[in-house]
């Protein structure tokens, strides 16, 4: 790699012994060495340095391929920056790096986050483990290929949690919703806690470390649904069962079992963990924040889900308990040499417990532990083991049992889940241990590192392939890129024959082989190998140079750990066990060992498993996740650079970067290149060149050669970016000097002008002072002249006024005398006229009174005659129908109820008034008392003051008299008295002031109490009104529900079937007579002739219904803004009295007609038409129908209407002749407005129809809303991010924007205008169909809420959207929406604009200047009061200024936000920073009824088809 070109002043990274890398500024260059002043102030001389990108975003980049300088310090700094902001995921191409936060971040793993990443291309949203899972799933679905996700990292890096999240997301994508019972995805997910319980343990580095590797193959069918799964495990750490170091723990299952419920403890004969040898080797028994008792129950539940029966679970935990008891068996020396026996009673007890749990003979178990049988050709020899070998035999038995128990659990899970032979594709998730290098490395580390060497080779090949695909896609010329191939290391380990594993197997087959002979064999075989070395100070250790560094292995236990055999005595013991489960484990093992007589070791078998795994991975499309542990103390907020660099190296990330640097590490889009380096050739920006041509011109001008230009990007070799930055820095430095020179010139000119202006001001002031002195002298002289003139005028005027006043007094007296004489004459004449007028008026009034009495007598006689005639007619009608009597009784009952309620209301109001009066009286009395006290206090003060004054006067007179020696005592006493009186006066004055203050405060309290009393009175009135309204509403709903329940219970199936027949009779008023006919209830005809007319009536009624349904099935439009169909249906149902019958089919047929009209309907016009009709018809029903037991019809009572029947009849005679009859017998009942709609006690079919119609209204509303969302969704994707315009020609565009920077370019808001066009279209459609304004405003309110949710969520998930220019773009678009809301008026939009509060405040935060000066309080209370702390933290950390280069909020604010987010995440139920879309119905039936204006139903013209039919003539009746 060529050395980067730098100059003095460049910023570079240099090595640091404490921070790994530290940044500084170049101060001097000496050949290849540079002098760098670090940020700590220290000067470093080095020749190893890397350029630093000073323009890198403050929050880092989400994909490290976007870094201008792709090198180790740049990668490290980017990861550290993002980790500080809780951004734990970062891409490196399509590789995901996950840094363990060591704290819970539940808000980024919730279901709504899964929905956001579903179907989104990789890299479009912020880095996330869900994005990798989705990319694998989409590649499998679209390309039909098998995919794999490889999760790697060292212990504690978060591999297990990452794998669980991946499997959870894949189950979310491929799950089956609504399926009952155990599904495959549930079993796959629940297998994790089972395997964790038996395969995970606490280590020094991790509290939940997986001590085995696993590869989960999830199978999918052709529809992308999970159809099966298989789990493969690798290299379980068997030695942990018997040996653990402090403060580690054994496998979790042992501790879970010790914390089981008491009955299980007793069953398995367990005690506290510290009583068992296999557990008390460490002082750690419990994990922080983990409840073993609840985890035990959770594990049992998970075992149920994965298909392990209760009997099998009991057997599993019996084996686990038996292993604990085996560990407590100790041995002592026997009587014979090299023999052993059970040490004590405690060991014997544990032996018996283990035998009982394993269901085998205790003596046989003892013999198997301490005796061995050797078979020779001559005889069978039985020998006894010494205590050490007996302990080794015990531990071997425990490890063998546990390892095969674990294998059985894995096989059982696979069997239970099942594999689908018809599956089309799979996604494999590999969770395997990362590269390990400790002080002591044994056989386990050797196998683990061998695995990682294999995976690293696969990883390098994949990275190289991705590089080639990138170059090929961009159509640039490329040559072979060299990368370090670790094939030689793999051959060193696995070559057959001659590899380390082969030599180890060879040593295991010879009984006399030791680790020393094995080590010597290695040294002899590989002494010339480049990757193999022998440490100088050890005879048995050996060192291998892996890809991640050198590792020294201790070969002491290699041979023992590589052997895989079972003692024959152990196998015979457990094969004969009475427990089928235990016998099955060892029986299966016996079958496996009997099939092959060839020696099989752990290493060889692991190599075969690894070879099989690599074959599986090679057949899939890989996706990589590298997990990083930021520190070794397992605490959040700590980032250890050396530790992270080591893991990046072990994970192959740095190797991938090196491969990238071998080609073209710097890749910039044309737009970004021109934005950064366009200033190197300003003439290019001023011209109308294509972006690609402009980039070529800049590179040619700077004479660069190591680059390639692709289709969309520029590819730069290593060092070229630094050279461009150096030249750019030079240009910027020259420009800075020019700016400084101009600034200094400006400041000097400004200083000169200020001095000159000061001199001018001083001169002007002096000249002004002289001029003012002269002017003052002239003013004094002029004033003296004016004073003399005015004095002379005053004297002359005073003389004239005196003479004039005397003359006026004389004239006034004479004129007054003449006027009084004239006034007396006029009063006399007026009195005479008044007397005459009163006399004439009295005579006329007497005549009028007599005439009026005669007329009244005549009118009364005539009205009595008419009343008797009408009374006879009413009595005849009452005898025929009996309806009037029922109406009279019901109305009288209603009058009594209303009277009682009125009396109750009056009584409540009277009580309230009395309480008010009493309270006011108390307050007035208290006020009066305080006033009296104040008067008394004032009087006392006055008296005291008078007494003091007298005393002072007396004292003064005394002082004036001559004083003699004998009066000294008297003078002293008087002085004391004066002082006492003065003190008393001051105290009384103070008391008076306090009383005055108390009085004022009492007045204020009195006013406040009066206000509170008035407010309480108003609230009581409002509450009483609200309670009354709610009581009426509840009563109405209870009545409806009661009717519906009773009717549903009483109607038999046969009756229900009859109720749906079209032949059901509907009450109808005949036009010939004012009587009512119903074929089922009234009998106006003779019995023998009843059937034929009734049949004719039913047929006629059926024809009328068919005609009505035929009419409303078509679009019959609107009449003067009123929906004709709704009015037509309502008038017909009222006229036919359909609401009052027990059975009818008309309602069901109307509902079916509406359903057929809107079913699968995509036409907004049709939906809006039926929405308008449904709303109007529901409004009629809401105002008309009420639940009741009878079907009588009542009219709302007007104020002042008489309560008795005859009173109303007599009142009707005094009204107009047209209203003399019953209101429902005239057209006014239908033709009136809403205030005159009569109420009907509806029956079951009518109430059911109302509920069905309400459901259809909500359905139509939802269809319109969802259709609008579907149309707007594609447009919103283009509205969240500002479209990029060609960078060349930008200078010209800037000059135009400078002249008119208010109006945004039309292409920039084209997408927003499309949304406005869509909204206008729907608004016109709804207004054309006269949809109620309430529904229109609710629709747009939810649409704007949807826009708010989509834009806000996209803003929080896409870092490129959280920029200054993007905020301006979205703000411009929101202004378009605000303008539309203003034009559409509040009547139709309502509070829709307020629904955008989240995105408006977020955008306002993006575009505000001087963010670092804003405090958290200002942000949360003034700028963004609606946003939560999680949302503010997300925006603040993702913000970047692509226009002015400013920074986000201060680091102190960020730290405070992070702390609050951490606190909230611990306490809140939901921590998601995303918004949820609300799809509820935001209105009620009452809201619609109250919002709609009066509708004159009678004024609606029926359609021609109805108008021409004589049976519908009642529709043509009009109201006056």
From Swiss-Prot:
Location in or out of the cell: Cytoplasm
Chief localisation class: cytoplasm
Keyword vocabulary terms for this entry: Actin-binding, ATP-binding, Calmodulin-binding, Coiled coil, Cytoplasm, Motor protein, Myosin, Nucleotide-binding, Repeat
Region (Actin-binding) residue spans: 492-526, 528-551, 586-610, 610-632
Cross-referenced Pfam families: DIL (PF01843), IQ (PF00612), Myosin_head (PF00063), Myosin_N (PF02736)
Composition bias, Polar residues: 1076-1086
Transmembrane segments: none
UniProt domain Dilute: residue ranges: 1148-1463
Chain ranges of the IQ domain: 732-761, 755-784, 780-809, 803-832, 828-857, 851-880
Assembly mode: Homodimer. Interacts with MYOB1 and MYOB2. Interacts with PHOX1.
Protein name from the UniProt record: Myosin-5
Organism of this sequence: Arabidopsis thaliana
């Amino acid at each position: 790699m060529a050395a980067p070109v730098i100059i003095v002043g460049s910023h570079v990274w240099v090595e640091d012994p404490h921070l790994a890398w530290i940044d500084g500024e170049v101060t001097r260059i000496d050949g290849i060495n540079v002098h760098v002043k670090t940020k700590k102030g220290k000067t470093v001389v080095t020749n190893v340095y890397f350029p630093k990108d000073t323009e890198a975003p403050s929050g880092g980049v989400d994909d490290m391929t976007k870094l201008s300088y792709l090198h180790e310090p740049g990668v490290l700094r980017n990861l550290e920056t993002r980790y500080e902001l809780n951004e734990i995921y970062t891409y490196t191409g399509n590789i995901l790096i996950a840094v363990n936060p060591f704290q819970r971040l539940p808000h980024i793993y919730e279901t709504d986050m899964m929905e956001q990443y579903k179907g989104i291309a990789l890299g479009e949203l912020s880095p996330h483990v869900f994005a990798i899972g989705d990319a694998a799933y989409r590649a499998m679905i679209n390309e039909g290929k098998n995919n794999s996700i490889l999760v790697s990292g060292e212990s504690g890096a978060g591999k297990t949690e990452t794998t669980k999240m991946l499997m959870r997301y894949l189950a979310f994508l491929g799950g089956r919703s609504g399926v009952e019972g155990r599904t495959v995805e549930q079993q796959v997910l629940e297998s994790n806690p089972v395997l964790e319980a038996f395969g995970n343990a606490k280590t020094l580095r991790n509290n939940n470390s997986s001590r085995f590797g696993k590869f989960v193959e999830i199978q999918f069918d052709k529809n992308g649904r999970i159809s099966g799964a298989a789990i493969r495990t690798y290299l379980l750490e068997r030695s942990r069962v018997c040996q653990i170091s402090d403060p580690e723990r054994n496998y979790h299952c042992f501790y879970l079992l010790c914390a089981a419920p008491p009955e299980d403890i007793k069953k398995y004969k367990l005690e506290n963990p510290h009583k068992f040898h296999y557990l008390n080797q460490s002082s750690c028994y419990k994990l922080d924040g983990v409840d073993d008792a609840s985890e035990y129950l959770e594990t049992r539940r998970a075992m149920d889900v994965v298909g392990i029966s209760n009997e099998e679970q009991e057997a599993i935990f019996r084996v686990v308990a038996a292993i604990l008891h085996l560990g407590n068996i100790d041995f002592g020396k026997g009587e014979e040499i090299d023999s052993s026996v059970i040490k004590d009673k405690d060991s014997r007890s544990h032996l018996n417990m283990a035998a009982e749990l394993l269901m085998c003979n205790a003596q046989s178990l003892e013999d198997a532990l301490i005796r061995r049988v050797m078979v020779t050709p001559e005889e069978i020899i039985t020998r006894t083991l010494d205590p050490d070998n007996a302990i080794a035999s015990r531990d071997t038995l425990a490890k063998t049992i546990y390892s095969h128990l674990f294998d059985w659990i894995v096989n059982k899970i696979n069997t239970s889940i099942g594999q689908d032979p018809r599956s089309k594709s799979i996604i494999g998730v590999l969770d395997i241990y990362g590269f390990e290098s400790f002080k002591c490395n044994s056989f386990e580390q050797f196998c683990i590192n061998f695995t990682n060497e294999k995976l690293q080779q696969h990883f390098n090949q994949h990275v190289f392939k991705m590089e080639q695909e990138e170059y090929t896609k961009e159509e640039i010329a490329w040559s072979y890129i060299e990368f370090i191939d670790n094939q030689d290391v793999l051959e060193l380990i696995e070559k057959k024959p001659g590899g380390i594993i082969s030599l180890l197997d060879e040593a295991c087959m010879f009984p006399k082989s030791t680790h020393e002979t094995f080590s010597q064999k290695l040294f002899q075989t590989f002494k010339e190998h480049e990757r193999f070395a022998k440490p100088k100070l050890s005879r048995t250790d050996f060192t291998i140079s892996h890809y991640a560094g050198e590792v020294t292995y201790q070969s002491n236990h290699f041979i023992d750990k590589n052997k895989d055999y079972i003692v024959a005595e152990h196998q015979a013991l457990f094969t004969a066990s009475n427990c089928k489960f235990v016998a099955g484990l060892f029986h299966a093992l016996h079958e496996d060992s009997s099939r092959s007589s060839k020696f099989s070791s752990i290493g060889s078998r692991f190599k075969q498993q690894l070879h099989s795994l690599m074959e599986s991975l090679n057949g899939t499309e890989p996706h990589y996740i590298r997990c990083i542990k930021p520190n070794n103390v397992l605490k959040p907020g700590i980032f250890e650079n050396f530790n992270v660099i080591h893991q990046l190296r072990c994970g192959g990330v740095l190797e991938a970067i090196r491969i990238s640097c071998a080609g073209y590490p710097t890749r910039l889009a044309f737009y970004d290149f021109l934005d950064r380096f366009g200033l190197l050739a300003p003439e290019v920006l001023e011209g109308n060149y294509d972006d690609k041509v402009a980039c070529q011109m800049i590179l040619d001008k700077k004479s660069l050669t190591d680059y390639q230009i692709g289709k969309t990007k520029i590819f730069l070799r290593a060092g070229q970016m630094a050279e461009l930055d150096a030249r750019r820095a030079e240009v910027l430095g020259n420009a800075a000097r020019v700016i400084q020179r101009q600034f200094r010139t400006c400041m000097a000119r400004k200083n000169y002008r200020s001095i000159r202006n000061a001199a001018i001001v001083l001169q002007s002031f002096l000249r002004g002072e002289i001029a003012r002195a002269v002017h003052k002298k002239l003013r004094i002289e002029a004033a003296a002249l004016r004073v003399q003139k005015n004095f002379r005028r005053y004297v002359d005027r005073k003389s004239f006024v005196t003479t004039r006043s005397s003359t006026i007094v004389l004239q006034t007296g004479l004129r007054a005398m003449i006027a009084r004489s004239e006034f007396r004459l006029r009063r006399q004449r007026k009195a005479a006229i008044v007397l005459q007028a009163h006399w004439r008026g009295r005579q006329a009034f007497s005549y009028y009174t007599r005439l009026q009495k005669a007329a009244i007598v005549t009118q009364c006689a005539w009205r009595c005659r008419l009343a008797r005639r009408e009374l006879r007619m009413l009595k005849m009608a009452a005898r025929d129908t009996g309806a009037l009597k029922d109406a009279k009784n019901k109305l009288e009952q209603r009058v009594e109820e209303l009277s009682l309620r009125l009396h109750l209301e009056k009584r409540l109001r009277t009580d309230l008034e009395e309480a008010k009066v009493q309270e006011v009286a108390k307050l007035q009395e208290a006020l009066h008392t305080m006033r009296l006290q104040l008067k008394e206090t004032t009087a006392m003060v006055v008296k005291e003051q008078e007494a003091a004054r007298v005393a002072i006067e007396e004292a003064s007179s005394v002082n004036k008299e001559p004083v003699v020696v004998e009066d000294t005592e008297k003078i002293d006493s008087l002085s004391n008295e004066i002082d006492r009186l003065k003190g008393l006066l001051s105290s009384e004055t103070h008391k008076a002031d306090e009383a005055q203050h108390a009085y004022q405060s009492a007045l204020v309290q009195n006013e406040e109490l009066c206000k509170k009393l008035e407010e309480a009175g108003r609230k009581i009135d409002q509450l009483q009104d609200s309670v009354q309204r709610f009581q009426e509403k509840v009563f109405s709903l209870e009545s409806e529900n009661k009717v519906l329940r009773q009717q549903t219970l009483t109607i038999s199936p046969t009756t229900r079937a009859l109720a749906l027949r079209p032949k059901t009779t509907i009450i109808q008023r005949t036009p010939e007579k004012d009587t009512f006919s119903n074929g089922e209830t009234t009998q106006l005809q003779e019995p023998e002739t009843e059937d034929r007319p009734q049949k004719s009536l039913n047929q006629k009624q059926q024809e009328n219904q068919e005609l009505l349904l035929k009419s409303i099935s078509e679009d019959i439009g609107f009449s003067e803004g009123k929906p004709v169909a709704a009015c037509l249906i309502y008038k017909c149902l009222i006229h036919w009295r359909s609401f009052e019958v027990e059975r009818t089919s008309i309602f069901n047929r109307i509902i079916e007609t509406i359903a057929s009209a809107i079913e699968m309907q995509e036409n907004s016009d049709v939906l809006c038409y039926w929405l308008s009709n449904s709303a109007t018809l529901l409004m009629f029903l809401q105002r008309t129908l009420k639940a009741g037991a009878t079907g009588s019809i009542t009219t709302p009572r007007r104020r002042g209407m008489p309560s008795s029947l005859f009173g109303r009849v007599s009142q009707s005679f005094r009204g107009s002749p047209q209203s003399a009859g019953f209101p429902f017998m005239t057209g006014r009942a239908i033709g009136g407005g809403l205030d005159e709609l009569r109420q009907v006690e509806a029956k079951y079919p009518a109430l059911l129809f109302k509920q069905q119609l309400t459901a259809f209204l909500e359905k139509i509303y939802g269809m319109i809303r969802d259709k609008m969302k579907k149309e707007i969704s594609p447009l919103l994707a283009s509205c969240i991010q500002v479209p990029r315009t060609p960078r060349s020609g930008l200078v010209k565009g800037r000059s135009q924007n400078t002249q008119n920077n208010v109006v945004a370019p039309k292409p920039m808001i084209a997408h927003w205008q499309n949304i406005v066009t869509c909204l206008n279209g729907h608004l016109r459609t709804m207004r054309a169909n006269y949809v109620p304004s309430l529904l229109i405003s609710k629709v747009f309110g939810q649409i704007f809420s949807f826009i708010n949710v989509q834009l806000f969520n996209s803003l929080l998930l896409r870092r490129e959207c959280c920029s200054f220019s993007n905020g301006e773009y979205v703000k411009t678009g929101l202004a378009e929406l605000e303008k539309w809301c203003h034009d559409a008026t509040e009547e139709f939009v309502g509070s829709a604009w307020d629904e955008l509060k989240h995105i408006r405040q977020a955008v306002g935060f993006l575009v505000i200047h001087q963010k670092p000066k804003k405090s958290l309080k200002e942000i949360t209370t003034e700028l963004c009061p609606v946003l939560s702390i999680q949302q503010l933290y997300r925006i603040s950390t993702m913000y970047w200024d692509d226009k002015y280069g400013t920074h986000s909020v201060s680091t102190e604010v960020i730290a405070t936000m992070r702390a609050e987010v951490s606190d909230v995440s611990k306490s809140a139920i939901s921590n998601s920073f995303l918004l949820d879309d609300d799809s509820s119905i935001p209105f009620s039936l009452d809201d619609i009824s109250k919002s709609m204006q009066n509708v004159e139903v009678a004024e609606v013209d029926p359609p021609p088809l109805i108008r021409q039919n004589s049976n519908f003539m009642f529709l043509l009746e009009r109201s006056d």
